Amino acid sequence: MVDYHAANQAYQYGPNSGGGNGAGGGGSMGDYMAQEDDWDRDLLLDPAWEKQQRKTFTAWCNSHLRKAGTQIENIDEDFRDGLKLMLLLEVISGERLPKPERGKMRVHKINNVNKALDFIASKGVKLVSIGAEEIVDGNAKMTLGMIWTIILRFAIQDISVEETSAKEGLLLWCQRKTAPYKNVNVQNFHISWKDGLAFNALIHRHRPELIEYDKLRKDDPVTNLNNAFEVAEKYLDIPKMLDAEDIVNTARPDEKAIMTYVSSFYHAFSGAQKAETAANRICKVLAVNQENEHLMEDYERLASDLLEWIRRTIPWLEDRVPQKTIQEMQQKLEDFRDYRRVHKPPKVQEKCQLEINFNTLQTKLRLSNRPAFMPSEGRMVSDINNGWQHLEQAEKGYEEWLLNEIRRLERLDHLAEKFRQKASIHEAWTDGKEAMLKQRDYETATLSDIKALIRKHEAFESDLAAHQDRVEQIAAIAQELNELDYYDSHNVNTRCQKICDQWDNLGSLTHSRREALEKTEKQLETIDQLHLEYAKRAAPFNNWMESAMEDLQDMFIVHTIEEIEGLISAHDQFKSTLPDADREREAILAIHKEAQRIAESNHIKLSGSNPYTTVTPQIINSKWEKVQQLVPKRDHALLEEQSKQQSNEHLRRQFASQANMVGPWIQTKMEEIGRISIEMNGTLEDQLSHLKQYERSIVDYKPSLDLLEQQHQLIQEALIFDNKHTNYTMEHIRVGWEQLLTTIARTINEVENQILTRDAKGISQEQMQEFRASFNHFDKDHGGALGPEEFKACLISLGYDVENDRQGDAEFNRIMSVVDPNHSGLVTFQAFIDFMSRETTDTDTADQVIASFKVLAGDKNFITAEELRRELPPDQAEYCIARMAPYQGPDAAPGALDYKSFSTALYGESDL
C-alpha cells in the first residue's frame, strides 16, 4: 500500500476545485444533492448497470489515484480498509484529511472510512443510508453509491450552464456542442449515447483533427464507441471506462456511468471555455430580450381579449328592459347567476394575472436595464381597470333589478288572478239581473204580488249595495294592474269597463223599477212579514257566506313568518265567529219554518218560493256546508305556508350564521395582509413564506365560501328577498373574496419582485430593511406608495441633493422619470428599491455585450454570420443576423455585421 500522505497535495481537479470545493463550494451542495437523491432510490442494481458502474467508477478512480502512484483492481474490496478512499479524496480535493489508522482490525477500517465519509459530509453532501460498516463489509450497492456521490460532488457539481443544475448543465453543454452534428440528438444520459456518435461529436467539436466524423455510420455503434474511447484514451488522457459491447447490448445504459464518462470529456475540454463564456453572455442577454418580447406579446393578447370580453358584457348587463312573464325574468336571473358562477371568475383571475405579468415584466425590464414597457394605446393597466370598473358599475344592482321585476310580475299575476276571480263572481251574480229588472210583471200582479215584488226589490237593492264593494275592488285592482304595466291590461280594462257599464245600467234599472213599484205601493195592503224578515236576514247572511267563501279561497303571498301568522290569526278570528253565524243561520231557517207552519195551519197555498228573495233554505244550507268544507282546507293551506316560512327562516338564519363568520374572516385577512406588507418582520423569504401560508389558508377557506354560495342558492330558489339576521349579502361576500384573492396575489408578487431585485442587485437583507424603514416612515397613509413630496422628503433624508432650487428640481425630475416612467404621480416600494439598488450596485451594460461579441469576432470591429452560427445556438444566431445592420467601417469585409449598434439597441440606447 502506497503511503497516501506522500501523494501530490497540490493537485486540484477542474477549474473550480480545491478551496472552492470546501466551505464555499458546499454552500449550495445540500440543495444540489437533494436534487440528486431521487437518482439513488433503487434497492437493487440492474446487473448490466452494476457491471457498467463498476467498470466506469473503477476507471474514474484510477484516473486520479495514478497521480498518487497507485490504483484499485476491485472497487468492492480495495476501499474496505478506507486508506485508498482517503487517498482518492485527498487527490481530487487538494486538501489533507486526518491521519489514517494503520491497524488491520475492523474497527481501524471503520474509523478510516468514517473519516472519509465525514470529509464528504463536510462538503455539504447528504450521505443517504451510506454507513462505514457497509463499505468495510464490501457492500457493492453502498460502495458504488458512495463513489457516485464523490463523482457528483467533485466532478459534476461545478458544471453549470446558464444557471442550471449540475446534471441539467452537463446535458445542456452536450446538447450545444453536438447540435450541428447529424444523427446526434442528446436528450438524456443513457440511450442517446448508445450509437457512439455523441461521443465522437464531442471530440470532433473540440479536436476535429482526431475524428473523421463523416465516415462514421449510425448502424455500426460498436465501431463508433471503440473509436471514441480509443481516441479519448490516446490523445485526451481519458481512460477507457466502458466496453462498447456492454453499452450496445444493454437496453438502457447506466445513467451514472455515462454521466461519469461524459464529465471527463467536459473537464478535458474546459480549456475551450473562454469563447463559450462570451457566447453564454450574449445568449443570456438575447434570451432576456426574447423573453421580454414574448411577455409583451402575451400582455397585449391577454389585454385585448379581456377588454373585448368587457366590451361585449357591459351592454348585456346594462339591458334593463323588463319581460312580460315571470318565466322570462327567471331565465334572465339564471343567465346572470351563470355569468357570476361560470364566466366572471376566470376573467377575475385573468385580470389579476395580467397585472402580475405586467409588474413582473416591468421589474425584469428594470433589472435588465431595458426601457420600461408601454402597452399600445387603450391597453394600459389603467384602461383595463377603467373598463373593469365600468363592468362592475353595470353589474351593480342588476340582480336586485331582476328580483324586483320578478316580485313585480308575481304581484301582477296575483292581482290578475284576483281580478279574474272577483270578476267571474260578479258576472255570475249579475247574470239575468238586467232581464229581471226590465220585467213589467207588476202591471198584472195582484196587491199581494205587488207587495211581494216591492219587498223582493228592496232585498235586491240590499244585495246590490252589498256588491258595491266588490265592484269598487274590481276597479281598484284593474287600476293597479295598469299602474304596474301589466302586459294583458287591455283585456283587463275591457272587462272592467264592461262590468262598470253594466253596474251603472243596473243602478239605473233598479231606480226605475223602484219608482214603478212605489207608484202602485199605495194600492197594496198586506205583506208577509215572515217572508220579508226572512229575505232581509237571508240576503246579508248569504252575502256574508259568499264573502267568506271568497276569502277562504283567496290566494295569498307572504314572505315572512309574521305575515303568515297574521293570516292565521285572522283566520282563527274568523273561525271564532262561526258559532254566531250558525245561530243566525238557524234563526233564519226558523223564520222560514214558522212561515210554513202558519201557512199549513191556516191552509194557505204558497207558491213554493219566497216572493222576496231567491235565497232558499237549500241555498243557505248548501253554502254553509261549503263554508264548513273550506275552513279545514284553509287551515291546511295556512299551515303548509307556515311550514314553508319556517323553513325559509331557517335558511335565513343558516345563511346569516355562515355569512357572519365568512365576512369578518375576509376583513381580518385583508387587514393582516395589509399589516404584513407594511411591517418588516424577518427576511423577504420569511415574509414571502408567511404570505404564501396566508394564501394557502385563504384557498383552504374556499369550501366555506362554496357552502355560503350553496346556502345562497337555496335562498334564491326559495324566493327569499331579505334577511334581517345579517348585514352581509352574497354580493358583499363575493366582492370581498375577489378583493382578498387579488390583494394576496399582488402582495406576494411584490415580495417576489423585491427578492428578484435584491438577488439581481446584490442587496443585503439589512439594506432591504433600511429601504423599507425609510419608505414606511414617509408612507404616512400606509397606502404602499409615496407622492412626489413624500418621495422628495425621503430622498433628502437619504442624502440626495433635491432641495427646492433649480439644480435640485432638475435632479428630482430626473429621478422621478426613472421611478415613475408612466407619470402616475406615485412611487411604489418596488420602484424605490429599483432606484436605490441601481444607485448602489452595478448592472450589465451594452459595453459588456460589445466586449463579448468582440471575443467571438476575434478582436475585429465586425462579426460575420458564419461566426455567429458557429458560436451561438441556431435560433439566437438567426435572431442576431436578422437584426444586425451591415458594418460600414473602413475595415469592413464582405458580409460584415455591426455588433456595436446592435448591442446598444438592446439597452435602449439606439434603435434596432
Swiss-Prot record:
The Gene Ontology biological process annotation of the record reads: actin filament bundle assembly; bicellular tight junction assembly; gene expression; glomerulus development; peroxisome proliferator activated receptor signaling pathway; podocyte cell migration; positive regulation of pinocytosis; protein localization to bicellular tight junction
Compartments, as annotated in UniProt: Nucleus; Cytoplasm; Cell junction; Cytoplasm, Cytoskeleton, Stress fiber
Where would I look for the motif LXXLL motif in this sequence? Answer: 85-89
Q: Which PROSITE patterns match?
A: ACTININ_1, ACTININ_2, CH, EF_HAND_1, EF_HAND_2
Sites where Phosphothreonine occurs are at 250
Q: What segment(s) does the record annotate as region Disordered?
A: 12-31
| PTM annotation (Phosphotyrosine): residues | 32
Q: Looking at the record's lineage, which domain of life comes first?
A: Eukaryota
* Renumbered ranges of Spectrin repeats: 294-404, 414-519, 529-640, 650-753
Q: Where is this region: Actin-binding?
A: 1-267
InterPro entries annotated for this entry? Actinin_actin-bd_CS, CH_dom, CH_dom_sf, EF-hand-dom_pair, EF-hand_Ca_insen, EF_Hand_1_Ca_BS, EF_hand_dom, Spectrin/alpha-actinin
Q: What molecular function terms (GO) are annotated for this protein?
A: actin filament binding; calcium ion binding; structural constituent of cytoskeleton; transcription coactivator activity
Calponin-homology (CH) domain ranges (all copies): 51-155, 164-270
State the residue spans of region: Mediates interaction with MICALL2.
Answer: 737-912
* Residues of the EF-hand domain: 766-801, 807-842
Q: Which residues carry this modification: Phosphoserine?
A: 697, 910
Q: Which residues bind Ca(2+)?
A: 779, 781, 790
Extract the ranges annotated as region (Polyphosphoinositide (PIP2)-binding). 178-193
Keywords assigned? Acetylation, Actin-binding, Calcium, Cell junction, Cytoplasm, Cytoskeleton, Metal-binding, Nucleus, Phosphoprotein, Protein transport, Repeat, Transport
Q: Where is this region: Interaction with VCL?
A: 12-27, 41-62, 109-127
Write out the GO cellular component annotations.
Answer: cell-cell junction; cortical actin cytoskeleton; cortical cytoskeleton; cytoplasm; focal adhesion; nucleus; perinuclear region of cytoplasm; pseudopodium
- Function of this protein? F-actin cross-linking protein which is thought to anchor actin to a variety of intracellular structures. This is a bundling protein. Probably involved in vesicular trafficking via its association with the CART complex. The CART complex is necessary for efficient transferrin receptor recycling but not for EGFR degradation. Involved in tight junction assembly in epithelial cells probably through interaction with MICALL2. Links MICALL2 to the actin cytoskeleton and recruits it to the tight junctions.
This protein's assembly is summarised as: Homodimer; antiparallel. Interacts with MAGI1. Interacts with PDLIM2. Identified in a complex with CASK, IQGAP1, MAGI2, NPHS1, SPTAN1 and SPTBN1. Identified in a IGF2BP1-dependent mRNP granule complex containing untranslated mRNAs. Component of the CART complex, at least composed of ACTN4, HGS/HRS, MYO5B and TRIM3. Binds TRIM3 at the N-terminus. Interacts with MICALL2 (preferentially in opened conformation); stimulated by RAB13 activation. Interacts with PPARG and RARA. Binds to VCL; this interaction triggers VCL conformational changes. Interacts with SEPTIN14. Interacts with IGSF8.
Q: Which family does it belong to?
A: Belongs to the alpha-actinin family.
Record text about domains: Contains one Leu-Xaa-Xaa-Leu-Leu (LXXLL) motif that mediates interaction with nuclear receptors.
Q: What is this protein called?
A: Alpha-actinin-4
